[in-house]
C-alpha cells in the first residue's frame, strides 16, 4: 500500500503493552508507526530509538531528560499529534483519562487500554465479539487481558448456542513481572472484597447480553492469571461439541493437560 494511504499511528506509552502494540503496527501493510511517546529515558526508550522508531516526549521536562541521556527526541506529545490519524494510548491506569481531552481537542481518533473506565470512550472492544460496532467510531477501549479472556471464552459458547450463564473465579498474579521488585505479595492470598469482582461487569460493557459473575483473588506469583468457570448450558452438549465451540475461536488455544 502506498505510504500516503496508510493509517498513521502514534503509540503513547512504550511500556510492556505499548511495545507490543508498536511492534505489531510495524508489521501491518496498511499502517505506519509515526512515533512513540514516553516520559522516561531508560532502556525501553533506548530500545525504541535503536529499532528506528521516532521518539517523542510526553512533556517538555521529559524531553530534557531524554536529551541528557543522549536520545534523539522529535518533540513532545503535541508535536506527535500533528502527524497522526490514530493515537493508541498505552499509558498507566488513569493517565489516559487525562490525555483523551487533548486527543478530542485535536480531533484525533484514539484507543485506550483496559485500565481506563468504559466512560473514557463509551465503547469497549474485543474483536471477536463486537468488531462491527467499533466501525466509524472516534474512540474505543481495548479491555484488559482478564476481560478479553472472559469475552472470548464465553462468546465461543454463546456463538454455538450453548451459553446460558457463567460464574467464574479468577486467580490473578500479584504484580507485573517487571515490577516484582517494587510491589506484590508474599506467602498470602488477597481476595477482592466485592462480588462481583470488576472483571464480570467489565465483560458486560463489551456484550451486555452476557450473564456473568466473577470473583477474584490475588496470589503470590507473576506467571499469569488463571480462570475457573462454572457454566450453565442452554441445552445438553457433549464434550466434543464444547471443544468444537472453543476451536471456532481464532484466539483460543486448546492445550491437553498432559502437555501443559
Where are these regions (language model features)?
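N-terminal Rossmann-like NAD(P) cofactor-binding subdomain of oxidoreductases
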Residues: 2-177
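Active-site-lining helix/loop region of Rossmann-like oxidoreductase modules
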Residues: 6-23, 155-258
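Compositionally biased, intrinsically disordered low-complexity regions enriched
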Residues: 86, 91, 104-105, 248-254, ...
Amino acid at each position: 500500500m502506498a505510504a500516503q494511504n496508510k493509517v498513521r499511528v502514534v503509540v503513547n506509552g512504550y511500556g510492556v503493552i505499548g511495545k507490543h502494540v508498536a511492534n505489531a503496527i510495524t508489521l501491518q501493510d496498511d499502517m505506519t508507526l509515526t512515533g512513540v511517546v514516553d516520559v522516561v529515558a531508560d532502556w525501553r526508550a533506548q530500545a525504541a530509538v535503536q529499532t528506528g522508531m521516532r521518539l517523542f516526549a510526553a512533556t517538555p521536562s521529559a524531553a530534557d531528560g531524554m536529551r541528557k541521556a543522549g536520545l534523539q527526541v522529535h518533540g513532545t506529545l503535541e508535536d506527535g499529534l500533528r502527524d497522526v490519524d490514530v493515537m493508541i494510548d498505552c499509558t498507566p491506569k488513569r493517565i489516559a483519562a487525562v490525555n483523551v481531552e487533548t486527543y478530542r481537542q485535536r480531533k484525533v481518533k484514539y484507543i485506550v487500554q483496559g485500565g481506563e473506565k468504559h466512560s473514557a470512550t463509551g465503547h469497549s472492544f474485543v474483536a471477536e465479539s463486537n468488531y462491527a460496532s467499533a466501525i466509524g467510531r472516534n474512540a474505543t477501549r481495548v479491555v484488559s487481558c482478564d476481560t478479553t479472556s472472559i469475552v472470548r471464552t464465553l462468546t465461543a459458547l454463546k456463538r454455538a448456542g450453548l451459553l446460558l450463564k457463567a460464574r467464574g473465579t479468577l486467580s490473578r498474579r500479584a504484580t507485573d513481572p517487571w515490577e516484582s521488585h517494587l510491589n506484590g505479595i508474599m506467602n498470602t492470598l488477597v481476595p477482592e472484597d466485592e462480588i462481583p469482582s470488576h472483571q464480570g461487569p467489565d465483560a458486560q460493557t463489551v456484550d451486555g447480553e452476557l450473564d456473568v459473575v466473577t470473583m477474584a483473588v490475588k496470589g503470590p506469583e507473576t506467571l499469569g492469571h488463571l480462570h475457573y468457570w462454572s457454566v450453565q448450558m442452554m441445552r445438553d452438549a457433549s464434550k466434543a461439541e464444547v471443544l468444537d465451540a472453543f476451536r471456532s475461536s481464532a484466539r483460543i488455544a486448546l492445550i491437553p493437560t498432559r502437555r501443559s
